Amino acid sequence: MIKPHGSDELNPLFVYDTQQRHALIAEAETLPSILLNSAAAANAVMLGGGYFNPLTGYMNLADSLAVAEKMRTVDGLFFPVPIVNMTSETGIEAGSRIALRDPNMEGNPILAIMDVEAVESVSDDQITFMAEKIFRTLDENHPGVATFSSLGRTLLSGPIQVLNFSYFQADFPDTFRTAVEIRNEIAEHGWNKVVAFQTRNPMHRAHEELCRMAMEQLDADGVLIHMLLGQLKPGDIPADVRDASIRKMVEVYFPPNTVMVTGYGFDMLYAGPREAVLHAVFRQNCGCTHLIVGRDHAGVGDYYGGFDAQTIFDEEVPEGALELDVFKADHTAYSKKLNKVVMMRDVPDHSMDDFVLLSGTAVREMLGKGIAPPPEFSRPEVAKILSDYYQTLDA
């Protein structure tokens, strides 16, 4: 199986030993504590599950600035975005041991324990520098920029011990998986070549066929459909609805034992190219050999070029930095001429009128009225689940 990023073995920061974990939970109740923001809590969950291997905790300011600038820590570890705990809390001292409380669960239970190695102030200029490097914009209308700029100006760095996986395990018991669990499941399947498909949206015909194309062209053993379960921007479809629609699609339209449907506990960054590279890092940690990167991967609005998330792998990711390979996909759509889903670049003789194309707004309006999109665009079983959801909103 492909090695994890940056090490020979996966190093999840969740405390798996039950006795030790219970002792730490008891200790945490005696420690000074801070309430994390959602971004720092999501980072803790990802660190706990081994997704951000080989990191051992939150980055310090020097590493955060270096990673933002050139995707490498001060010591040379390749990593695409800073993994930080930035807060507005005061009174924390370097050398202290603190409990980190979960902002996303009732009662704010303890999520992790942190050994604080450094407490550093982050200037507005440094926030601006990092935001521009990560998101390629400083527009506060960009949801990632808005979130990053509001995180606080005190950066806490140091190793953490993760004690639970927040709400993800309880709310999505059949879907949430750690990188450790996914690697184990891939091994149990006996898969050697595995293609990952990232999604924060429901999957329509084009997405379904894209997974199939990648699997066939790469002669892969299986596909990992890996959905984001954390916070999105307003208007995006909730995870439970996406989960149900994707599972129905896989059940009806894919051969048995060729697809794993799982999810991960992270908030969407909308960082386009940089987030695509982060997706590659943690899919390698999951045991995947390939990641599908399509048009406007991890993007939002018009902030990124259609294929910036592909070209970053050629132009900015050093050779050998990742073992995982990228499957570069063009925009896919149903061809009326060929009666199948195709990549647009593969059919230069087609005009736009030869494809079944619908905007997201048009699809939402149809589903909200109980009208199914054309079967060339969306499977009827998927459309039914989405239509039921949209009609509850309109009601």
Regions found by a protein language model. Name each.
Residues 1-395:
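Active-site cores that bind ATP or allylic diphosphates and position pyrophosphate for catalysis
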